Amino acid sequence: MEKTLAVNAGSSSLKWQLYEMPEETVIAKGIFERIGLSGSISTTKFNNEEHFRKQEIVDHRQAVLLLMDELIHFKLIHEFREITGIGHRVVAGGEFFKTSTVISPEVLAEIKNLSTLAPLHNPANVLGIEAFQRLLPDALAVAVFDTAFHSTLPEKAYRYPIPTKYYEDYSIRKYGAHGTSHMYVAQEAEKVLGKPLEDLKLITAHIGNGASITAIEAGKSVDTSMGFTPLAGVMMGTRAGEMDASVIPYMLESDPSLRNAQDVIDILNKDSGVLGVSELSSDMRDLSEAVAKGNPKAILAYEMYVDRLKKFIAQYFGVLNGADALIFTAGVGENDTAVRTDVVNGLSWFGMEIDESKNVRGAFGIISKPESKVKVLVVPTNEELVIARDVEAAK
């Protein structure tokens, strides 16, 4: 039986799902966390069982070796060659990659070159690709790009209002991210709403530690909040999101500990957002606990977070000239009842009314009242399934 592995490699993590294809049956899934850090742990789930293993994991290559060892140990596979395809999530494809692509040496080199567009992500994606290539050299490897879904953006949306030469000579433009997730939840919403995707105007809110909002018309991305890199857009767990670019040179001039622009970018990427304002955590669960205890910095961080989500969602009502539905997905979007309530109530003048009993349950489907002019949905994302499907399509 042929099996396909969907892989999402982060800077210190490796998330995976093993599928039986083309049936799309999930055999097992898991994650390696804190790779290269203290307290490394792996989680493997199958047959309603959950297995944990704590041990030092120094790099992605070791994580891949441990993963294959666990698949054999738990008899999820009997030999490596049962895995005939591996799909890798790659965040930035630039203008070069507009569809999922079989990984060749040339493709891998270009993914490395595009790391400037996703400095937190593409290097980690490359580590995952190279680690699996060493262990499973005969498996078909496919790169699935976060930016591909946004290749339909009109020029008025993806161009920045800067001199044209910077676009033509240096490809400086909006690329977006989380495209695989936005595409998947839009397709799932079509089933719930009972209308063809071609007839729908949707606003999708992928809200996790990283977050982005996308305007979708007739199944195509027409605008999105992330930009040249995933730093742009709404306030995120550790990323600042949208802000005045003049802050960068001012921070350099003001803080003698900062050596160059990259130091500032690192702060905006890794030490800002919810973490930077709350000075507590990048995790919304931690923030919610602190808000409940009256922590003023946590309260401010939460208010800023919700406010920026509302601003981008409101913008996209204008871009689409109205919308049929607002869709929440990803870690915060799927699980944080308060964020959904405060965002929707803050946009009630668009005709959205949340049903609190449905919102508290947070189950897949509509969580707005029947009379709500704009439907509000919770749709769990499944980027791994999209990745597995794209591998199958490439065979």
Swiss-Prot record:
Q: Is Protease one of the keywords UniProt gives this record?
A: no
Which UniProt keywords are listed?
ATP-binding, Cytoplasm, Kinase, Magnesium, Metal-binding, Nucleotide-binding, Transferase
Under the heading Pfam families, the entry gives: Acetate_kinase (PF00871)
Q: In which pathway does it act?
A: Metabolic intermediate biosynthesis; acetyl-CoA biosynthesis; acetyl-CoA from acetate: step 1/2
- Spell out the residues of the site Transition state stabilizer: 178, 239
> Which InterPro entries does this chain map to?
Ac/propionate_kinase, Aliphatic_acid_kin_short-chain, Aliphatic_acid_kinase_CS, ATPase_NBD
Residue positions binding ATP: 15, 206-210, 283-285, 331-335
Signal among keywords: no
Any idea of its EC number?
Answer: 2.7.2.1
Give the record's GO CC terms.
cytoplasm
List the Gene Ontology MF annotations in alphabetical order: acetate kinase activity; ATP binding; magnesium ion binding
Q: What are the names of the required cofactors?
A: Mg(2+); Mn(2+)
On cofactor binding, the record's note says:
Mg(2+). Can also accept Mn(2+).
Which GO terms of type biological process are on file? acetate metabolic process; acetyl-CoA biosynthetic process
Which PROSITE patterns does the record associate with it?
ACETATE_KINASE_1, ACETATE_KINASE_2
List the catalytic residues.
146
Catalysed reactions, as listed in the record: acetate + ATP = acetyl phosphate + ADP
Q: Which residues bind Mg(2+)?
A: 8, 383
Classification via CDD domains = ASKHA_NBD_AcK_PK
- Enumerate the residues binding substrate: 89
The subunit field of the Swiss-Prot or TrEMBL record says: Homodimer.
Q: Which family does it belong to?
A: Belongs to the acetokinase family.
Q: What does this protein do?
A: Catalyzes the formation of acetyl phosphate from acetate and ATP. Can also catalyze the reverse reaction.
Q: What is this protein called?
A: Acetate kinase 2
Q: Organism, per UniProt?
A: Lactococcus lactis subsp. lactis (strain IL1403)
